[in-house]
Amino acid sequence: TFTVSLARVMKELSLKPIYMPEDPESVLISSMDVNRPGLELNRFYDYYDTSRILIFGNAETAFLRSRDPEDRFEILEAIFSKHPPAAIIARGIQPSEELLTAVTNNGVPLLGTGETTSSLVAALVAFMNTELAPRITRHGVLVEVYGEGILLVGDSGVGKSETAIELIKRGRRLIADD
């Protein structure tokens, strides 16, 4: 399983720290998905994936504002006590005292951005999908033959490079060798 550091996410998306309990290089994220905590704000946790970054936008913030401060704190404390890797507030929204207290109590990094929630989610998911995509390593030679890419693969020493050299002598293009 691949991971990406919170520091890389912050740099890529130009996120500003609001509360950072530890070095963002040491916070590793393994989920490509993000979570806008609508159900969790209503105390439904059956499908709450704590490996995802939480995103708070206008809808989540408006819902929280509609609750009294004590209820708001209980909701946020329950969400952050499960220790998600980080939370991000979109649209330049200022965090409530209850949110700041809940992330501080539980050591969860809180970040902010002026981006719209939709833009933030799209950019974050695209970045995480690229960074956490499955990958494999193969020994091989990539050549172009009649406009098509061909990957010659095989065990070390079976003659992949020699085959590519013969193709190059016949006017084909080498793209990459090991």
Listing of model-derived features with the role each one plays in the protein:
Residues 78, 102, 166-167:
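Hydrophobic/aromatic ligand-binding patch that stacks against planar heteroaromatic rings
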Residues 127-147:
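P-loop NTPase nucleotide-binding/switch module
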Residues 71-72, 136, 160:
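Amphipathic coiled-coil/heptad-repeat helices and related helical stalk/stem segments
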Residues 147-175:
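Glycine-rich phosphate-binding P-loop
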Residues 52-55, 85-88, 108-111, 149-151, ...:
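Structural motif
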Residues 57-59, 91-92, 114, 146-148, ...:
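Fold-independent oxyanion-binding glycine-rich loops
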Residues 83-86, 92-127:
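Charged, amphipathic alpha-helical linker segments immediately N-terminal to NTP-binding catalytic cores
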Residues 1-80:
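Gly/Thr-rich phosphate-binding loop signature of adenosyl cofactor/nucleotide-binding cores
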